[in-house]
């Protein structure tokens, strides 16, 4: 196994984790709909317990996503998580209050009331997808950081990378295109949340409301996502010379990546078709409740392709707007050959982990959630 192969292999795995994370944001998307779908306390508890079965998957995937970056591309981890820490701290804090809200909203002695924690779930449902989408957009639009590896020998301050301003990552929200993708991810999460609850909840009224909410959320998602994607295809991209490592701007770089790596373009089209199929069939057929699966697979495929064209084909996946030559690539930010090779063998266990997750998912969802189950005091309902 060559060093180049392992660098591309680990970018593929991280891209897959990122794609799975976006799919699992259906938990956050559904939680933004607590009061839109739930008109009674029992209906709201149905929504919360539906997502409550899966919130750990989203949280652990987020942590694993960051951990994989730390192991495979540590310079990105130190630059982004260490420099843009306010952005990531807000994201992580919103996920922490999510966990607390699930556990304590209906506990005895909750003097804040269940509604307070339900509002916290909505906050996480909005902030999480919005900021994660904005963070991913910086892979294409750049961030303000400087990298100087020579500083590692400086005794007074051996800091390799630092943020170029005092915003500590919050400046990403000043770029309207980062916000556009963030809003697109938010509406996508709401769509997936609606499809998931329609499949997971055995309550006719709630399922009908989910269907009615699909169309406006889909239209909003398409407006924001297509605006970002079309602009992405025509904008200049960040490329590096494979021999020298010098980074330069290249016109239509991301479109070129899709054309050069043409199998990815096919995967992208399949993903879009699957996503729209899941949405439209659910909206058009009253008795169809499995739209989450084609839509979920489509989401994973589309996001996977976006990540891959951001890092493969001599593309700088984390561009620097402050210093172009500080931009990070899978070559200049990766771990050593020994580390990547060792982790390669460990990664062969991933299919077994996925099989266990699938088993747990099936065990939790083999029976659809009902109002009676939520009302049962002996159940473990939230």
Question: Where do the model's predicted regions map?
Answer:
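Transmembrane-helix bundle segments that line or gate the permeation/cavity pathway
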Residues: 24-32, 52, 60-108, 124-151, ...
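Long, contiguous internal "core" modules enriched in hydrophobic/ aromatic residues
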Residues: 108-289, 305
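A C-terminal functional module that forms or caps the active site or interfaces directly
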Residues: 296-326
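Membrane-interface capping segments at transmembrane-helix boundaries
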Residues: 280-287, 356-371
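Alpha-helical transmembrane segments
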Residues: 8-22, 82-95, 122, 126, ...
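Short, membrane-exposed interhelical loops at transmembrane-helix boundaries
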Residues: 246-252, 318-339
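N-terminal signal-anchor module of multipass membrane proteins
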Residues: 1-59, 63-66
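Short, highly charged, low-complexity non-transmembrane loops/tails of multi-pass membrane proteins
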Residues: 366-382
